[in-house]
Swiss-Prot record:
Cellular component terms per the entry's GO annotation: cytosolic large ribosomal subunit
Gene: rpmC
SUPFAM superfamilies: Ribosomal protein L29 (L29p)
Protein name: Large ribosomal subunit protein uL29
Family the entry assigns: Belongs to the universal ribosomal protein uL29 family.
Membrane-spanning intervals of the chain: none
GO BP terms, alphabetized: translation
Example GO molecular function: structural constituent of ribosome
Ribonucleoprotein found in the keyword field: yes
């Protein structure tokens, strides 16, 4: 999984790819929290990075839902 993916890169992904990225990030966050609880987490910063990535994915999905941004293959950001 890429560390610190940019919103521009996320906007280039399809909705299915975004959903998959969201699922993977949530799974990673769960594993990181489990490691933290058991005292095995070496990189605390990764928790924040994964949470930010999840928020970015949700933001891109919401932009598309509201018609503020176009996904790949769509002519523009507005729905008709």
């Amino acid at each position: 999984m890429a560390v610190g993916i940019s919103p521009g890169e996320l906007r280039e992904l399809t909705e299915e790819e975004l959903t998959e990225r969201l699922r993977e990030s949530k799974e990673e966050l769960f594993n990181l929290r489990f490691q933290m609880a058991t005292g095995q987490l070496n990189n605390n910063r990764r928790l924040r990075t994964v949470r930010q990535e999840i928020a970015r994915v949700y933001t891109v999905l919401r932009e598309r839902e509201l018609g503020l941004a176009a996904g790949p293959g769509e002519p523009d950001g507005k729905e008709s």
